[in-house]
């Protein structure tokens, strides 16, 4: 699975290619509402459906005649690490899980980068999101905020070294979403009950300069 607010060309395809070169059958995909996958509004944040995308991938792979259903695993990169964990908790067909530079999007939107987000700020953002739902409903048009590439996001300065340069930029993806849907992340807790995945193996890949 590709990073949040990315598309499959941004990291996921590379990982799939490397896995294929190692002899595995690999599938990369665009999350619902992103890239070439369907769904409106574009760029919507719906963690439960992001989780479902992993199980949908298992549906597809597990019905190919050349696939061993007992050897299907998932890889989640950055934000997709959390979605991959959540999928593995509830889908026993996933026999192994790996995450790379996993980022807990739920925790980020609850407490901010390095826990700098206050309850007051969070509640203010939830109120703004609620008001934007009325606006979108009455106008029939989604309300978009700044994209993940914009400086309003503290991590943008580092992530733009990839997403806004030749090696990582995809012209069709401005990484914008609807602030109203960000509220869905507040209720996303992928680490809860993670021990239920056992005895299936889990690999967390981390790095100091990821």
How would you name each of these model-derived features?
Residues 2-7, 78:
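Active-site glycine-rich loops that stabilize anionic/oxyanionic intermediates
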Residues 5-17, 31:
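The serine-hydrolase catalytic nucleophile loop
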Residues 11, 44-65:
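Alpha/beta-hydrolase active-site loop
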Residues 18-38:
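Conserved alpha/beta-hydrolase
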Residues 65-78:
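Alpha/beta-hydrolase fold nucleophile elbow
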Residues 85-165:
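Alpha/beta-hydrolase-fold enzymes
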Residues 176-194, 208-210:
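Active-site nucleophile elbow and catalytic-triad environment of alpha/beta-hydrolase enzymes
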Residues 197-198, 204-206:
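Short beta-strand/loop motif that positions the catalytic acidic residue
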């Amino acid at each position: 699975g590709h990073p949040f607010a990315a598309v499959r060309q941004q990291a996921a395809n590379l990982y799939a290619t490397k896995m294929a070169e190692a002899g595995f059958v690999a599938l990369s995909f665009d999350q619902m509402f992103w890239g070439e996958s369907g769904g409106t509004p574009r760029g919507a944040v719906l963690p439960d459906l992001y989780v479902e995308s992993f199980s949908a991938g298992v549906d597809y792979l597990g019905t190919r005649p050349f696939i061993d259903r007992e050897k299907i695993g998932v890889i989640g990169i950055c934000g997709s690490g959390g979605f991959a964990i959540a999928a593995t908790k509830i889908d026993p067909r996933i026999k192994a899980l790996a995450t790379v530079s996993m980022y807990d999007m739920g925790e980020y939107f609850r407490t901010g980068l390095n826990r700098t987000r206050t309850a007051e700020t969070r509640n203010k953002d939830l109120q703004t999101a609620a008001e934007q739902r009325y606006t979108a409903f009455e106008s029939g048009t989604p309300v978009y905020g700044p994209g993940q590439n914009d400086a309003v996001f503290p991590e943008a300065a580092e992530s733009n070294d990839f997403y806004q340069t030749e090696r990582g930029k995809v012209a069709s993806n401005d990484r914008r979403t609807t602030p109203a849907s960000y509220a869905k992340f507040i209720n996303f807790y992928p680490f809860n009950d993670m021990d239920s995945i056992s005895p299936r193996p889990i690999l967390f890949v981390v790095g100091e300069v990821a």
